[in-house]
Amino acid sequence: MSEERVRKIFEEAELAPRVGQLEVTEKLAEFIESGKRILFAAPTGWGKTIAVLAALKAAGAIPAYWLVRALDIGERIAEDAARLGMFAYVAGGREKTCPLAEQLGDSIHDFCKIARHKCPHARLPPEPPVAKDWREILKLAKGYCPYYAQDMVPSELVIQNYHRRRVRPARACVVDEAHNLVEPHEKVITIARLAEAASALRHSPASSHLVSAVEKLLRHVVSIAEGPVLTSLYFDEDCYNELRRIYAELLIEEPERARALRPLVDLAQGTAYIEEEIHIFKEPQLPRYRPLVLVTATPPPVLPLEVEVELRIPQAVKPKAVLLSHVTTAFSQYSKRMATEYKKLILDWAKRYKRTLVVVPSERVARDLRAWATHYETAPPKDWEGVLMFRARSRLSEGLDLKAELVIVAGCPYLPPNVSEQLARYYRSKGLPDPAKLAIDAPMLVATVQGVGRAWRDPSAPPTVVLADWRFERYKEELKAYFDLEEH
């Protein structure tokens, strides 16, 4: 791959490459041409998106998929692709594009797979529709399925979330914010929805054995203030198979009734943990494409991904991080007194700064601290001031720019123990070394650094960081890759 070829792509787009960007793009293009699985790590603001797009174009690896955790950033990627003369399409999932999504809720995915022959919209357009994103498809779709019509849209780059099906031939696949692949896929349901599912099951042709098992499971869930949901104590294989059969039959005959059962199906096949709501976790999945480009600003110290080559651009500037060891959110040590200590440190630190992000590890901690936040779990106004609080791994933890001068990580954001155990089994099946430690450490470190990344939008002006939990002391060596540490 010649540097002139890469340089010409930048010149035609009237883009002035940053220091090192041409060389990195050239190397990426070489790896893509040779079919490698690549980790590309560079700081926020370095220009990763343009570099990867230019490398795809230089390598002739088009059409390609670009996978994102949330479609919020899809428009920006499409705009960058357009600057390089590439036509991108931002594809929505069924929940955004299916005409039956509002009626069937999250059971729409299973309905589409099992009962598509019953769908009144299951037709394709006579000609490929021309559109830039799923919103335009919705406006165009008359008498055909908007979701499947997206597979016909002419484009060189398809931008979609990690979980949407991929049926088009592609010469490469890019995974944006690939650090998310160390985390299990999480779904949240309310206890009320689970109770509705149990009620719906009683009015279905279910055996007394299954109904009894579900009622015992529901009593178990209601009795837990916080902790793992021990589904396997109540659900044997016969229960699970019968539930799946009833659910599939209802999808065909009475899909709206099937919708009510979906929370039970999710709970039966996932690993769950209760806080205020039920969090259901499933194993992460790595796309099986080759070439594959994994893009991230925050790679964990050990990346449990099947990577063959790495390109890492070091951070020119690191945030200063203060370690506070007099507090912790560890389950056995957290108390009302500890919550008061966290309130004190938030007030003491936040009064020195215009904007403060507070990242909390769980709903349990959020309940005690959110009254002290100006904004909680909501995108703030553009000119916001005060304290914005969100849970690690929540919607606000990814994809939004929440520029702030101070970030307080109020507790180590570990996964629940039973979820870490499930993740360890998955890592063990992949032959990764020390899977139990990896399943505990990697998601916690990624969630910590991601929380800080939400506030750090200017590479030359990092926020001050407060790591408020004595357990961060265990990770000094790993944290030095991201922060200049200072003990307080």
State each model region's role.
Residues 324-358:
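Conserved interdomain hinge at the start of the Helicase C-terminal
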Residues 2-41:
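Conserved pre-motif I regulatory segment
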Residues 327-335, 380-471:
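Conserved RecA-like P-loop NTPase helicase motor core
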Residues 34-54:
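Walker A/P-loop
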Residues 3-10, 62-156, 245-248, 252, ...:
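A substrate-engagement module of RecA-like helicase motors
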Residues 357-378:
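Conserved helicase motor "Helicase C" RecA-like lobe of SF1/SF2 P-loop NTPases
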